[in-house]
Amino acid sequence: MEDETLEDGPEEEEEDEEEGTAEETNQDVTERDEEEEAEKDEEEDKEEEEEAEKEEPPPHMPLSEEMLRDGLSLLCKTGNGLAHAYVKLEVKERELTDISVLQSFIHLRYVDLSQNSLQDLSPLGALTHLLSLRADHNQLVSVSGLGELPYLQVASFAQNRIKSLQGFGHPRLETLNLIGNELRDLEGLECSNLSSLHTLELRSNQLLSTAGLNLPSLRELYLGQNNISRLEGLEALVNLTTLHLRDNQLESLDGFSEHLQALQYLNLRSNMVAKLQEVQKLYCLPRLRALVLRENPCEEEEGYRMETLIALPQLERLDKDFFEEEEKREAAETKKAREEEMAEPGEKGN
C-alpha cells in the first residue's frame, strides 16, 4: 500500500476557474468569471440555509447497514493480495451524525460523507489506507480528531463551521478545501505537518491576515471572500504560481516578497487599492503574467492599463484583456523617455 497513488482522486471543483494562466483566451476568462459569479451566489444561498439549521441540534442518526450496502463500491484486493474488500464509500444527504461503525472498515480508500450532520470524524482515524476524504456541508468545528492519515492526498471540508486547524497534519496531503468555514487565522498550517500540500482553498472564511502560511510546497492559494487587510508571511511560498485575493480589504500592496519567484497569476479584484502607484510594489514578482485589479478604486485613474504595463513590463494580461504588441511598445517607449528625462538634470550638472 505504500506506493499506492490516487487514481480517481477528484480535483478541487472550484479551483480551476481561478487559475488564470497566461495561455487563456479572453473567452476563457469571461466564462470563468461568469461561472465564479454564479457559484458565489449559490454559496451565499447555501450559507443562509445553513444558518437557519444551526438553531437546533440534529437528531441522532447512525450509519446503518442498509446505508453501507448502498454506499460501498469498488471491490479491490487488500494489501496482502490474498483477499478482497470494498475500498470506496459514498453516503450523502442522509442526515448522519454517527459514523463510529466505520472504524472497522480499515480498507477504505475513498470516502465521501458530504451533506450530512456530522460533528465528529474521529472514527476515520482508523482508516490508515485512506486516499481521499470529502465531508463537505456538515457541522464540523474541528478536524483535529482525524489523527495522522499517512496516505491521504485529497481532503475537502467545505461549508462547515471549522474555526481552528490545530492538530491537522497529513504528510502526503496535496489538496485541501476549506471553503466556507469560520477560520479567523491560519495557525496550525505548518510545513512539518503538510509537506506535500500544493493546493489550498480558503475562500469565504473570516481571515484577517495571511500570516501563518509556512508552506513552501504550495502552488495554488485561494483566499477570496475574506476580510484580509494585511499581507504577511508570503515569503515562505517560494513555489506559489497562483494567488487569489478577490473580495478582501486590501488598501496597499505591501507584503509581496522577492521570494515569490514562481508567482504567475494574481487576482486582487474587488479590494480597496486606491492608488495605482501601489502596483509598483509588484515589480519584485519577475514571473507575474496575469494581474486582475478591476473593481478597485485605482481602476478609475487615467492611463490605468498603460501605467500598469509601464510598472510591470512582464505582464501579458490585465483583468480580462491581453496586452497588444502596440501597447507593449508604447509602454516601453514611455518608460525609456521618463528615465531619460529624470537623468537629464544630473547630466547637465556635470
UniProtKB/Swiss-Prot annotation:
<keyword id="KW-0966">Cell projection</keyword>
<feature type="domain" description="LRRCT">
    <location>
        <begin position="296"/>
        <end position="334"/>
    </location>
</feature>
<feature type="repeat" description="LRR 8">
    <location>
        <begin position="262"/>
        <end position="283"/>
    </location>
</feature>
<dbReference type="InterPro" id="IPR001611">
    <property type="entry name" value="Leu-rich_rpt"/>
</dbReference>
<dbReference type="GO" id="GO:0031514">
    <property type="term" value="C:motile cilium"/>
</dbReference>
<dbReference type="InterPro" id="IPR003591">
    <property type="entry name" value="Leu-rich_rpt_typical-subtyp"/>
</dbReference>
<keyword id="KW-0963">Cytoplasm</keyword>
<feature type="region of interest" description="Disordered">
    <location>
        <begin position="1"/>
        <end position="64"/>
    </location>
</feature>
<keyword id="KW-0175">Coiled coil</keyword>
<feature type="repeat" description="LRR 1">
    <location>
        <begin position="107"/>
        <end position="128"/>
    </location>
</feature>
<feature type="coiled-coil region">
    <location>
        <begin position="314"/>
        <end position="344"/>
    </location>
</feature>
<dbReference type="Pfam" id="PF14580">
    <property type="entry name" value="LRR_9"/>
</dbReference>
<feature type="repeat" description="LRR 4">
    <location>
        <begin position="172"/>
        <end position="193"/>
    </location>
</feature>
<keyword id="KW-0677">Repeat</keyword>
<dbReference type="GO" id="GO:0005856">
    <property type="term" value="C:cytoskeleton"/>
</dbReference>
<feature type="region of interest" description="Disordered">
    <location>
        <begin position="325"/>
        <end position="350"/>
    </location>
</feature>
<dbReference type="GO" id="GO:0005737">
    <property type="term" value="C:cytoplasm"/>
</dbReference>
<feature type="repeat" description="LRR 6">
    <location>
        <begin position="217"/>
        <end position="238"/>
    </location>
</feature>
<keyword id="KW-0206">Cytoskeleton</keyword>
<dbReference type="InterPro" id="IPR032675">
    <property type="entry name" value="LRR_dom_sf"/>
</dbReference>
<feature type="repeat" description="LRR 7">
    <location>
        <begin position="239"/>
        <end position="260"/>
    </location>
</feature>
<keyword id="KW-0282">Flagellum</keyword>
<keyword id="KW-0433">Leucine-rich repeat</keyword>
<feature type="repeat" description="LRR 2">
    <location>
        <begin position="129"/>
        <end position="150"/>
    </location>
</feature>
<keyword id="KW-0969">Cilium</keyword>
<dbReference type="InterPro" id="IPR050836">
    <property type="entry name" value="SDS22/Internalin_LRR"/>
</dbReference>
<feature type="compositionally biased region" description="Acidic residues">
    <location>
        <begin position="1"/>
        <end position="54"/>
    </location>
</feature>
<feature type="repeat" description="LRR 5">
    <location>
        <begin position="196"/>
        <end position="216"/>
    </location>
</feature>
<feature type="repeat" description="LRR 3">
    <location>
        <begin position="151"/>
        <end position="171"/>
    </location>
</feature>
<protein>
    <recommendedName>
        <fullName>Leucine-rich repeat-containing protein 23</fullName>
    </recommendedName>
</protein>
